[in-house]
From Swiss-Prot:
One of its GO terms (molecular function) is flavin adenine dinucleotide binding. NAD(+) binds at residues 273-287. The lineage of its organism: Bacteria, Bacillati, Bacillota, Clostridia, Thermoanaerobacterales. Pfam families: GIDA, GIDA_C_1st, SAM_GIDA_C. Homodimer. Heterotetramer of two MnmE and two MnmG subunits. PROSITE patterns: GIDA_1, GIDA_2. Keywords: Cytoplasm, FAD, Flavoprotein, NAD, tRNA processing. GO terms for biological process: tRNA methylation; tRNA wobble uridine modification. GO terms for cellular component: cytosol. It comes from Carboxydothermus hydrogenoformans (strain ATCC BAA-161 / DSM 6008 / Z-2901). NAD-binding protein involved in the addition of a carboxymethylaminomethyl (cmnm) group at the wobble position (U34) of certain tRNAs, forming tRNA-cmnm(5)s(2)U34. This is tRNA uridine 5-carboxymethylaminomethyl modification enzyme MnmG. The keyword Oxidoreductase does not apply.
Length: 631
C-alpha cells in the first residue's frame, strides 16, 4: 500500500560517490534534501580499488574540493598512503594518488552526511521515478513510501539490474554482495530512456598473513605532507607501503589453457567492459607478446588483513583464481579472503542529458555517476557535485551551473558524455583535455573556488583561506617583477652552484626564474626570502613564470573556442531544415540536440564543413529576424 512519506526539495537516489556529493551540495545550498540508499552500510562504498586519485582523476578530486565538495577532505582524513605522481614530468600531468582505509572512508563520509544540516539519510529501494507531464515529482520505494520533490538526482552506480559472475556461477547482486536495484531500470525505460549494459570487475582480496613480501618490491608513499583538500593542512596520516610483483609464463599458461572457463570468452558476459582497466585474461590475450604484467598488492585498511590485488581483475572460476595467484612471486602460499568477480549492470545513454546532467525530456530529473556510463569514484564525484548543484539551482529557479572544457576536467568529462556518448565505461585521461596545462592539480582553487562561493557552496572559512593564498601568489609575483638579480659576488656563487651564467646587467627575478636551471630554491637564496612564502604559493608562481608563453597560447585558443560556445542553438531545432548538412550530421545533431555551436562541432560524425553550413544558416536566420523586427 502506497503512502506519502515526506516532501523534499531534492531527492538523491543512491549514496555512492556521486550520490553523497550531490546530496551534500544540495543540502549545503540550503535545500531540504533526502538521500536514499539500498543499505546504510554501503554509503560511499569502495567496492573496487581502495584508492583515490591518479592521472586526471586526482585533479577531479581537487576540483570537487575547490567547489566545496567532500571527497578530498574525506580522503585526507582516511588515507594510509599518499604519493605525488609524475614528479619528473611537466605540471600538466602531476597529480596525487592516495590509498584509503576503505572502512574508515565510509564511516567518515556517513558521519559527515548524518551531521549535515538539511540532509536526511534513509535506507530504501527506489523502484519508480514519479513524473507528471514533463516534470519529475518524486520517487516510490519498494515498501510503498512516496517521497515527493521538485528535483530528483539518480546516482544508482552499478546496482541497476546487476548480477555477479564468477566462472559459471552467476546471481543477481549489487557490488560486494550488497542488495541490487531490480525494478528501477524498468521505470527508466518506461519513461523513455535508452538503456545499455556494461560490465566491470574487481580482483580478489587476499590475506596479508599469507604473503611473502620479501619476494616483492616495496612501494612506499611520500614522506612529505600532501593533501587533496585546500582545507586539510596539519593533518598527520600514516604511511603504509604497497608492494609490486609480476605475472609470469606459468600464470599466462594457466589463463590461456582455461579460456573456455572464462565467462568473458564463453559469451556469458554480454556487457562491455572498461577499455582502460582490462581483466588479467584480457591482458594476456591482447598483449600476448608481453612476458609479464605488473601486479600491486594494496592494503585495504589499518585494521584488516585484506589486501587488494591490483592488476588481477578477473571473472575466472574461484579454483583457477587461487591457482593463478600462487604462480606470482610472494603469493606461493596465498589465501583468498574474497574472490574476484565481474559485475554487469544497466546504464543510461548519457546523450539523453543536458550539460547540466538534467534529462532533456523530463524537467528536474538529473543523473550522475556510473549510471551515465562512466567508471571510477572520482568521475562519479565530479558528476555528483555538478548534478547536485544544478538540482538545487533548478529548484531555486536560478541559472544553471555549467563547467566548460577550458575550466575543469569535470567540464571535459560531462561534455564528452553528453556530446559523444559512450561505447565502454568512460574513464578520464589527461589526453582528453585540450587545455590540460590550464587544468592542473595545483590551480583547481584558482579556477573554481570563486564559482563555488557565488553559488553558496564554498564556506566563508574556505573563501578566506583562498583569498589569502591568492594575495600571497600576487605578492610573490610582484616581488619577482620589481626586484633585480645583479652579478654581486654572493649572487655569482649561487649562480655557479646552479650552473647558470651571470647576467651582464641586472634582470628581474621573474626573468631569472624563466631559466630552465633555476628554481624557487635558487630564487630564495638570491633574495634571502627563505621561509617567507608557503610551498604551494612558490610552486604556483614558478609554474606561471616558466610556462607563461604556453599558458598565454592556450588562453588565446580558448578565446576562439568561446566564440563557438557562445553561439547558442535552440533546443527544439530541426536540423533537417538546414540545406547542405550531411545526412549523418542531420541524424546526429537531431539526436544530441547540442546547446551551442561548440558542442555541435564535437559531435562524432559532424565535420568542419557541416559547422560552416550551420554557421551560415544561423547568420542568415539572424538577418531575417532583424529585418523582420525592423519592418
Amino acid at each position: 500500500m502506497e503512502y506519502h512519506a515526506g516532501d523534499y526539495d531534492v531527492i538523491v537516489v543512491g549514496a555512492g560517490h556521486a550520490g553523497v556529493e550531490a546530496a551534500l551540495a544540495s543540502a549545503r545550498m540550503g535545500l531540504k534534501t533526502l538521500l536514499l540508499t539500498l543499505s546504510l552500510d554501503n554509503v560511499a562504498l569502495m567496492p573496487c580499488n581502495p584508492a583515490v586519485g591518479g592521472p586526471a582523476k586526482g585533479v577531479v578530486v581537487r576540483e570537487v574540493d575547490a567547489l566545496g565538495g567532500e571527497m578530498g577532505i574525506n580522503t585526507d582524513k582516511t588515507y594510509i598512503q599518499i604519493r605525488m605522481l609524475n614528479t619528473g614530468k611537466g605540471p600538466a600531468v602531476r597529480t596525487l594518488r592516495a590509498q584509503a582505509d576503505k572502512r574508515r572512508y565510509q564511516e567518515e563520509m556517513k558521519k559527515t552526511i548524518e551531521r549535515q544540516e538539511n540532509l536526511y539519510l534513509k535506507q530504501a529501494e527506489t523502484i519508480k521515478i514519479l513524473v507528471e507531464g514533463e516534470k519529475v515529482r518524486g520517487v516510490l520505494t519498494r515498501t510503498g513510501a512516496v517521497f515527493t520533490s521538485r528535483a530528483v538526482v539518480v546516482t544508482s552506480g552499478t546496482y541497476l539490474n546487476s548480477r555477479i559472475i564468477i566462472g559459471d556461477v552467476h546471481y543477481p547482486s549489487g557490488p560486494a554482495g550488497f542488495p541490487y536495484a531490480s525494478l528501477l531500470s524498468k521505470s527508466l525505460a518506461d519513461l523513455g530512456f535508452k538503456l545499455g549494459r556494461f560490465k566491470t570487475g574487481t580482483p580478489a582480496r587476499v590475506d596479508k598473513r599469507t604473503v611473502d613480501f620479501s619476494k616483492m618490491i616495496e612501494q612506499p608513499g611520500d614522506d612529505r605532507p600532501l593533501y587533496f583538500s585546500y582545507m586539510s593542512e596539519g593533518i598527520k596520516r600514516p604511511n603504509v607501503s604497497c608492494w609490486l610483483t609480476y605475472t609470469n609464463l606459468e600464470t599466462h599458461t594457466i589463463i590461456l589453457e582455461n579460456l573456455h572457463r572464462s565467462p568473458l570468452y564463453s559469451g556469458e558476459i554480454k556487457g562491455v567492459g572498461p577499455r582502460y582497466c582490462p581483466s588479467i585474461e584480457d591482458k594476456v590475450v591482447r598483449f600476448s607478446d608481453k612476458p609479464r604484467h605488473q601486479v600491486f598488492l594494496e592494503p585495504e585498511g589499518l585494521d584488516t588483513y585484506e589486501m587488494y590485488v591490483q592488476g588481477m581483475s578477473t571473472s575466472l572460476p574461484e579454483d583457477l583464481q587461487i591457482k593463478m595467484l600462487r604462480t606470482l612471486p610472494g603469493l606461493e602460499r596465498v589465501e583468498i579472503m574474497r574472490p574476484a568477480y565481474a559485475i554487469e549492470y544497466d546504464y543510461i545513454d548519457p546523450t539523453q542529458l543536458k550539460l547540466t546532467l538534467e534529462a532533456k525530456h523530463i524537467q528536474g530529473l538529473f543523473f550522475a555517476g556510473q549510471i551515465n556510463g562512466t567508471s571510477g569514484y572520482e568521475e562519479a564525484a565530479g558528476q555528483g557535485i555538478v548534478a547536485g548543484i544544478n538540482a538545487a539551482l533548478y529548484v531555486k529557479e536560478k541559472e544553471p551551473f555549467i563547467l566548460k572544457r577550458s575550466e575543469a576536467y569535470i567540464g571535459v568529462m560531462i561534455d564528452d558524455l553528453v556530446t559523444k556518448g559512450v561505447t565502454d565505461p568512460y574513464r578520464l585521461l589527461t589526453s582528453r583535455a585540450e587545455y590540460r596545462l590550464l587544468l592542473r592539480h595545483d590551480n583547481a582553487d584558482l579556477r573554481l573556488t570563486e564559482k563555488g562561493y557565488k553559488i553558496g557552496l564554498v564556506t566563508e572559512e574556505r573563501w578566506r583561506k583562498f583569498n589569502e593564498r591568492v594575495e600571497k601568489i600576487n605578492k610573490l609575483m610582484e616581488f619577482l617583477e620589481e626586484n633585480q638579480v645583479t652579478p654581486t659576488k654572493r649572487n655569482l656563487e649561487i649562480m655557479e652552484e646552479y650552473g647558470t651564467s651571470p647576467p651582464k646587467h641586472g634582470i628581474s627575478g621573474k626573468e631569472f626564474l624563466r631559466r630552465p636551471e633555476i628554481n624557487m630554491e635558487a630564487i630564495e637564496k638570491i633574495f634571502a626570502i627563505d621561509g617567507q612564502f608557503p610551498d604551494d604559493v612558490k610552486e604556483q608562481v614558478e609554474i606561471l613564470v616558466k610556462y607563461e608563453g604556453y599558458i598565454e597560447k592556450q588562453l588565446k585558443e580558448i578565446e576562439r573556442f568561446n566564440k563557438y560556445e557562445g553561439k547558442k542553438l535552440p533546443p527544439d531545432f530541426d536540423y533537417s531544415k538546414v540545406k547542405g548538412l550531411s545526412a549523418e550530421a542531420v541524424q546526429k545533431l537531431n539526436a544530441i540536440k547540442p546547446e551551442n555551436i561548440g558542442q555541435a562541432s564535437r559531435v562524432s560524425g559532424v565535420t568542419p564543413a557541416d559547422i560552416s553550413v550551420l554557421l551560415i544558416y544561423l547568420e542568415s536566420r539572424k538577418s531575417e529576424d532583424n529585418n523582420g523586427s525592423e519592418a
